[in-house]
Amino acid sequence: MIIHYMYLLRLILLVFICITPVHGNSIYNLIKIPNLEIYEINTENRLKYFYAKSSFRLGVQKNIICENSNKDDLDNKYNLINKNLNKYSHNFLKKISLKYIVLCENLSIAGINTAGIPDNVMKTLILDIKFDHKYFERVIHHEIFHIINDSYKELFNEEKWTSFNNKNFKYSTCSTCSKKLGLDTYKHTNGFLTEYSQSTASEDMAEVFSHLIYKISKSKNDPILKKKETFIRNNISKIDKNFKF
């Protein structure tokens, strides 16, 4: 009788562990980011949202830093973020390896502020909810493209992309090596949507993708941009033929 009773207790404990939502260490085991708690896990496209309950540092040199936000700021930005990310179906997100969204503020890498940090290996996107409101929605999709690009490097060939530009144009070797940081959309594009588009090929692709998602097209009188938009559309359709811009 005692044996059966102990077995029953173990069974109840096992069931409790299985149905209890992930917290603290369990979240860390999932995505290797400390100090997180659940914000929302019951979403239309099954994305799981976490928030920083206290500041965290990441990376081998601990040079990725993000701070915790207050509840009002989280609540205000969550609806906006969720609205934008609901543009992506669960099927598409699964194909590009994105499952987790981390919300925090004052995100930086080696002292350089950034809107987001994508990690397709950990299926995670960290977003700075205090990033400039003027660009915030658009940069969400910019960061989504980096997840896509990292998951499908073979589709987004940078040499092919570079060939669309004027022959005398050269990108920087890295986005942080460039002083071209402006995010305002040009009135007169000449092959590039923003100053930041001119930093690297991958940033240029991300800017074109984010503008397409945000329903901003400047390619009518710009043959270079027309080629770039077609390239993005065609290769996204190879990932998911049902994807709609």
Region spans (language model):
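Auxiliary, metal-adjacent structural segments of Zn-dependent hydrolase domains
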Residues: 59-121, 129
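Polar/charged alpha-helical tracts
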Residues: 29, 48, 79, 83, ...
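Hydrophobic, Leu/Ile/Phe/Ala-enriched alpha-helical segments that form helix-helix packing faces
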Residues: 16-17, 81-92, 144, 148, ...
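Non-catalytic architectural context of zinc metalloproteases
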Residues: 25-74, 103-106, 173-186, 219, ...
